[in-house]
């Protein structure tokens, strides 16, 4: 039996509470946009300053992993949108399923990203840890036959790890949100009348996806100086 939604004492009714919660999420997302916007602005300025080094950095990216992760997140956005849809219809069974599939795809994304980080570590691309202008494949060659990376590629990789690292943290939070919503759904907190937390959680997940849609071309696809 679904539980009646609880209205906090500072609100007049459920509608006011719902609108306030939604506004709060949009306000939070606005601050997140500012945060990532600053990172993108700094990245763009540095790319204009050292175009060749940043082009070389993009060429060192695992474009197939980035592409796979893009497909994973876009699919997860579909599932979370379906979760909102069935929540409005009061179909709790499918709500739990769609939220679960969204969380699973989030874990798949993190798994692929971890694999990519591992490969980049093996290739000596991590600033402050093992970055080298000479790739492991060329270290055994005579100096005349080596093709060193630009020293400024270190800056590209720094931006790469900062931006994708912060994004990965947001994905982890998003997975936690999906799991929390599943717990609430199983306890009967949602019905066709009250499902605002699902909509708010979906807003956050869509934001995560949108950020990646900008990160992927900026870091992986812009291979022209």
Predicted stretch roles:
Residues 1-225:
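...captures the hydrophobic TM-helix bundle architecture rather than a specific catalytic motif
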């Amino acid at each position: 039996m679904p539980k009646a939604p609880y209205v906090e004492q500072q609100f007049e009714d459920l509608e006011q509470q719902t609108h306030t919660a939604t506004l709060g999420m949009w306000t939070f997302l606005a601050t997140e946009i500012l945060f990532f916007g600053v990172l993108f602005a700094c990245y763009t300025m540095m790319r204009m300053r050292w175009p060749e080094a940043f082009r070389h950095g993009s060429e060192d990216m695992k474009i197939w992993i980035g592409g796979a992760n893009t497909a994973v997140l876009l699919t997860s956005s579909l599932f979370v949108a379906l979760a909102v849809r069935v929540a409005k219809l009061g179909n709790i069974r499918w709500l739990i399923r769609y939220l679960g599939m969204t969380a699973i795809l989030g874990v798949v994304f993190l798994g692929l990203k971890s694999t990519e980080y591992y490969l980049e570590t093996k290739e000596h691309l991590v600033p402050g840890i093992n970055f080298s202008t000479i790739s492991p494949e060329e270290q055994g060659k005579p100096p005349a036959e080596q093709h060193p990376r630009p020293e400024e590629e270190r800056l590209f990789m720094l931006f790469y790890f900062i931006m994708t690292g912060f994004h990965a943290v947001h994905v982890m939070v998003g997975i936690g949100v999906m799991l929390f919503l599943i717990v609430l759904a199983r306890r009967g907190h949602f019905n066709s009348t009250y499902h605002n937390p699902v909509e708010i959680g979906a807003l956050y997940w869509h934001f995560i996806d949108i950020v990646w849609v900008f990160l992927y071309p900026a870091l992986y696809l812009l291979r022209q100086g």
